[in-house]
């Protein structure tokens, strides 16, 4: 594991950490019971099988 030779300043630490951002999931349009809905791509298969109720998303 890398060990820093010198202490990183608070400003540099916070600038580096600010680059880590969460982004919203990409939404895909899927038709369930004749009603088009936008849902996250990773949930499409479960919604089509009826494992997840799209009303609760």
From Swiss-Prot:
A Pfam entry, by short name: Ribosomal_L32p
Example of a GO cellular component annotation carried by this entry: large ribosomal subunit
Record keyword Protein biosynthesis present: no
Gene Ontology MF annotations: structural constituent of ribosome
InterPro entries cross-referenced by the UniProt entry: Ribosomal_bL32, Ribosomal_zn-bd
Region (Disordered): 1-22
Keywords: Ribonucleoprotein, Ribosomal protein
UniProt feature, compositional bias: Basic residues: 1-20
UniProt superkingdom: Bacteria
One GO biological process term: translation
Annotated signal peptide: none
NCBIfam families noted in UniProt: rpmF_bact (TIGR01031)
Membership in a protein family: Belongs to the bacterial ribosomal protein bL32 family.
Protein name in the entry: Large ribosomal subunit protein bL32B
Organism: Nocardia farcinica (strain IFM 10152)
Gene from which this protein is expressed: rpmF2
């Amino acid at each position: 594991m890398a060990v820093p030779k010198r202490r990183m300043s608070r400003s540099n630490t916070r600038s580096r950490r600010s680059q880590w951002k969460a982004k919203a999931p990409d939404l895909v349009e899927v038709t369930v019971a004749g009603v088009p809905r936008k849902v996250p791509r990773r949930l499409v298969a479960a919604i089509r099988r009826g494992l997840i109720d799209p009303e609760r998303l």
